[in-house]
Each structure stands twice: as C-alpha cells, then as structure tokens.
C-alpha cells in the first residue's frame, strides 16, 4: 500500500482485499515482467476469453470486471487512478459491456466449421456468483443470499454500493451484476474443507461418499468444537483433518478425533461463519432479513442447511442446486427479450425447481455456542 493508500483503494473499488484479486496479479507482473504488459494488446479475463473465441470481440463483461479491484464501483468504469497508481499500462483494459446483453455473433470460421447460421452470443455474468444470484427464488426486494459451493458467498442485493468505514473494516466487497445491481457480500471458504478432508481419507484408503460423511456427522456430539474456516492454514490442499485437530488443540477446544466429529466440526463452523457474516451485512445495511436464500451445490447437504438455519436463527430456503447454470440461461433469455425481467426469471425458476425449507431449531444452544465461536475467530 505504498503505491496507493489502502483506504483510498477501498473507497474507489469497494472490493474485499484478497491476495488472488486481479489487481495484485497484474501488480506482480508490473514488478517482475512489465515487458509482457507493454507488449500485450488487451487483458481478457477468463470468462471473456470464451466470448473472444466465439465472436472475436475483446470486451470485459461488467460482473467479472467488478471483481478485479480495478473498477470504480460507483461509476462502473475502469479506475484510472488505481491503474496509474499500480503502474499498469492503460491500453490493456478493454471496453466494459453490461451483463445480460449481446456481445457479438459467432465468427464466420466457427459457423463454417460447425455448419451453423450466425448466432448471437450473449454476455452472461462471467462471475458465476452473479449468474447464480439471478436464480435466487424470491420476489423480496431485501434478501440475504448464500451461494454455497467450494466457496461460499453471502450477501444482499443493492441498487448502489456501500463503501464506508464500517464496510471497509468488515472487508465486505461490492460486486456488479445484472442491471448494474450491486452484490454486497463476504467471500467465505465453503465446502473446500469437506472436499479436501474427503480426499485425505481416500488417500488413507477410506472412500467415503458425501452421504456417508453426513450420517457419521449426525451421530457425532453437537456444538463441541469449531474452526475459523477462513484461517490461512485451511486454504492449501492437503491433510485438513490434522490441521483441524491442531487448530482445536491450539484454541483449547475438544479435539475432534473421528471422521464424523471432523465433518460435524466443519459444518457447524461454516454455519456459524455465515451468521457472523450476516450480522456484519445487517449492521452495514441497517436492514433485517427473515430468510437466507441458499443456492448451489451446498444445498444438497441437509445437515449444512439445517445448521445454517440454526446458527442464523432464521428460515433457510435451499435450492436450486444448479443455480449458476439456470441463471446463465435466464440471462441469455433476458438478453434476447424472451424473458422480460429478472423478477420474471426468478419466478420461473422458483416454480420449476425443488426448493426445500429449513426452520431454525435449538436456538438457545446455538446462541450460546456462537459466543464461544466468536472467541476462536482468527
């Protein structure tokens, strides 16, 4: 932050500070291989690369551009101030196109090779969470969404970004989506710890299915031990169960020994982390939320859904599972005019998908455990 003040950086971009952000990747190239940037024509983000291959258009779709920490969140344009401060060549930044609009047509080469007529290509939300958000099955204006997969993203949808001292302190990000709406959200490690733990047990010769793991977790003692899923030791691949035991020992908690105890510890900790993020969101927006709309692969875990309802003290609406795919399709249909609005898209998805409802249970026990959980946060 010698190049640009951290507070100013956040005030402009409204993005959560994460090592993997595009701004820091490009800054690394500025420091080590600037000649590559000087020679480059345009920076094309990964989702936009597919559009380029299909159409030949070098554009940046708004939602994925908004995650780079190089976009002015209020203007919806590349920030000259940030780009200049980091020493990144301006010429590499392509034109930004709105989410859910036509970006071009298939190239002649593709049409000839595949025997296709000219087909329009739509700029769907390149940031998968923004596609998933389109499929949240609600008509409410104010709602909490939880897109749950390897990563979990918990937040709300706003007309304008929230960028102030409180949101900066909580490291909450503002990301763009369809209709220039803002997703005000926290990035949280999601099912990664479960997935990596399972891979470790497979390496040890125990090929448990996810259903088996859930059954074992249900039989384990409740609310005994917690981890901070976002602690740095849980990010690298490897022996997550051992790291969980070490974390619990270090923080003076009962050490989960069995497979079921480890899985229960992870699920309980995720649910508590969701509550923690939800409280920060509520504090920043000044709004209350009666339902958490949970979408994505994590909704297949009835245990995690129920724990989330218990921890957050509110109803959880779980589904659709394939939220990103459905949102992607809906955005294409909105771009073509076949669906007239995001409200219509959400209603169609709500009527066509299996949505399960979970009500909170054991409130006193979870509230008491939450106070213990907050003490072990990194």
Which sequence ranges carry the predicted segments?
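A conserved helix-loop-beta module that forms one wall/lid of the active-site cleft
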Residues: 86-101
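Enzymes and membrane/adaptor proteins characterized by extended Gly/Ser/Thr/Asp/Glu-rich
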Residues: 56-65
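Active-site core segments that coordinate phosphate-bearing ligands/cofactors
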Residues: 2-14, 18-57, 70-80, 84-85, ...
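Short, well-ordered beta-strand elements within core beta-sheets of diverse protein domains
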Residues: 68-72, 93-95
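Short beta-strand to alpha-helix junction loop
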Residues: 74-75, 99-103
């Amino acid at each position: 932050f010698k190049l640009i003040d951290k507070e100013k950086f956040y005030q402009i971009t409204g993005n959560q500070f994460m090592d993997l952000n595009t701004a820091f990747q490009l800054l690394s190239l500025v420091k080590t291989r600037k000649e590559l940037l000087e020679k480059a024509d345009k920076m094309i983000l990964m989702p936009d690369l597919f559009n380029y291959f299909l159409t030949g258009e070098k554009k940046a779709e708004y939602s994925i551009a908004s995650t780079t920490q190089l976009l002015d969140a209020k203007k919806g344009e590349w920030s000259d101030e940030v780009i200049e401060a980091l020493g990144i060549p301006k010429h590499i930044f392509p034109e930004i196109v709105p989410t859910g609009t036509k970006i071009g047509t298939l190239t002649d080469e593709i049409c000839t090779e595949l025997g296709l007529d000219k087909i329009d290509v739509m700029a769907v939300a390149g940031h998968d969470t923004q596609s998933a958000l389109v499929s949240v099955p609600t008509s409410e204006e104010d709602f909490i969404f939880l897109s749950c997969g390897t990563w979990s993203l918990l937040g709300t949808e706003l007309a304008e970004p929230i960028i102030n001292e409180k949101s900066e302190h909580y490291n909450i990000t503002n990301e763009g989506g369809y209709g220039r709406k803002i997703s005000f959200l926290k990035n949280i490690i999601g099912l990664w710890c479960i997935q990596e733990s399972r891979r470790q047990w497979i390496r040890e010769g125990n090929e448990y299915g996810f259903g088996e793991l859930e059954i074992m977790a249900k039989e384990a003692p409740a609310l005994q031990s917690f981890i901070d899923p976002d602690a740095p030791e849980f990010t690298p691949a490897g022996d997550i169960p051992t790291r969980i035991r070490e974390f619990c020992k270090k923080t003076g908690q009962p050490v989960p020994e069995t497979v079921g105890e480890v899985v229960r510890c992870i699920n309980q900790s995720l649910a508590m982390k969701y509550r923690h993020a939800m409280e920060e969101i509520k504090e920043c927006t000044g709004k209350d939320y009666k339902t958490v709309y949970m979408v994505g692969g994590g909704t297949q875990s009835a245990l995690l859904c129920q724990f989330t309802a218990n921890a957050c003290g509110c109803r959880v609406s779980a589904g659709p599972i394939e939220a990103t795919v459905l949102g992607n399709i809906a955005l294409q249909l909105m771009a073509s005019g076949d669906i007239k609005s995001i409200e219509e898209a959400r209603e169609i998805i709500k009527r066509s998908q299996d949505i399960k409802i979970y009500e909170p249970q054991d409130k006193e026990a979870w509230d008491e455990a939450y106070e213990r959980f907050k003490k072990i946060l990194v």
